[in-house]
């Protein structure tokens, strides 16, 4: 890349930086990006850059691969049904240990090393994420969000800290739940009136043709997104991600994005370039 191209990229980013300065962007961090050191470090730098130029990033994370690793170390077989982890009490204890004690702190340390200031919390802190059992309870301690209490986030964001939130909620009686991080991110984005919700995934975004990378839907709206589900253009694991975006938009989030976290700096490419890199859904 020559000097002229570098200047052009910075110039293209400027109006987006100005537009999103002071705005909250909720980012769900997960998938294979969490297992690749280069991708992890690029993500940490991206979050630091967003914060440095005045954007207010809030990171929600899961930790599936790391949870599975620890279950196997403890000679417990991970069990799934319809894509959801079967979570008994023993598994829940490990989920809490891994998400809050390992994954969360790794993200915090990674971002802090860049010179930015991240603070790690879980949905248990300040009753941030209230939850209940999902469905009929057949998945055990898998939960769904009933209420977000975002007050704990306000002083952190206002002082320039970057909240890093593990996707664990609890009932008012103190029963912890393992919750899908996509849906936690969507509900938090709605509760804090975020400008954007961004889901980092292992896919490009919404494809009109499943196996055709050239069929990426760069921009769509709520109605079309619902149609994609009804017409089975969106299938399998993309259904809950798209539904999560739809729900967030219906609650006032201005734009939701599904992007490929396997591409270095995909977060910046989506936010600060004209063409973006994934799928943007707007109301």
Curated annotation (Swiss-Prot):
Entry annotated with the keyword Protein transport: no
Record site feature (Transition state stabilizer), residues: 28, 241
Superkingdom to which the source organism belongs: Bacteria
GO biological process, one term: L-arginine biosynthetic process
Binding site residues for substrate: 63-64, 85, 178
Entries under InterPro entries matching the protein: AceGlu_kinase-like_sf (IPR036393), AcgluKinase_fam (IPR004662), ArgB (IPR037528), Asp/Glu/Uridylate_kinase (IPR001048), NAGK-C (IPR041727)
Location(s), subcellular: Cytoplasm
The protein's role, per its UniProt record: Catalyzes the ATP-dependent phosphorylation of N-acetyl-L-glutamate.
Entry GO CC: cytoplasm
Pathway(s) annotated for this protein in UniProt: Amino-acid biosynthesis; L-arginine biosynthesis; N(2)-acetyl-L-ornithine from L-glutamate: step 2/4
UniProt GO MF annotations: acetylglutamate kinase activity; ATP binding
The protein's name in its UniProt record: Acetylglutamate kinase
Lineage summary: Bacteria, Bacillati, Cyanobacteriota, Cyanophyceae, Synechococcales
NCBIfam families xref list: argB (TIGR00761)
Reaction(s) the record says it catalyses: N-acetyl-L-glutamate + ATP = N-acetyl-L-glutamyl 5-phosphate + ADP
Disulfide partners: none
Keywords, in A-Z order: Amino-acid biosynthesis, Arginine biosynthesis, ATP-binding, Cytoplasm, Kinase, Nucleotide-binding, Transferase
Family the entry assigns: Belongs to the acetylglutamate kinase family. ArgB subfamily.
Pfam families for this protein: AA_kinase
EC code: 2.7.2.8
Principal localisation: cytoplasm
């Amino acid at each position: 890349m020559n000097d002229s191209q570098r200047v052009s990229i910075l110039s293209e980013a400027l109006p987006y930086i100005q537009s999103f300065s002071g705005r909250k962007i909720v980012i769900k961090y997960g998938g294979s990006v969490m297992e690749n050191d280069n991708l992890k470090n690029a993500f940490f730098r991206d979050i630091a850059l967003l914060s440095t130029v005045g954007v207010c990033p809030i990171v929600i994370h899961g930790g599936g691969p790391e949870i599975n690793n620890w279950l196997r170390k403890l000679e417990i077989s991970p069990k799934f049904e319809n894509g959801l982890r079967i979570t008994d009490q023993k598994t829940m204890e490990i989920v809490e240990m891994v998400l809050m004690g390992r994954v969360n702190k790794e993200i915090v340390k990674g971002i802090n090393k860049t010179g930015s200031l991240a603070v790690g919390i879980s949905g248990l802190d300040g009753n941030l994420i209230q939850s209940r059992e999902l469905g009929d309870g057949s998945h055990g301690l898998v939960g769904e969000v009933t209420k977000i209490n975002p007050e704990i986030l306000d002083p952190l964001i206002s002082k320039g800290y970057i909240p890093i939130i593990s996707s664990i909620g609890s009932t008012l009686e103190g029963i912890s739940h393992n919750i899908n991080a996509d849906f936690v991110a969507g509900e938090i984005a709605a509760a804090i009136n975020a400008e954007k919700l961004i889901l980092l995934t292992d896919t490009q975004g919404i494809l009109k043709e499943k196996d055709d990378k050239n069929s990426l839907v760069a921009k769509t709206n709520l109605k079309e997104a619902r149609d994609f589900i009804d017409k089975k253009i969106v299938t399998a694991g993309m259904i809950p991600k798209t539904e999560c975006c739809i729900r967030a938009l219906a609650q006032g989030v201005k734009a939701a994005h599904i992007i490929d976290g396997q591409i270095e700096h995909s977060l910046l490419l989506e936010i600060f370039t004209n063409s973006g890199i994934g799928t943007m859904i707007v109301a």
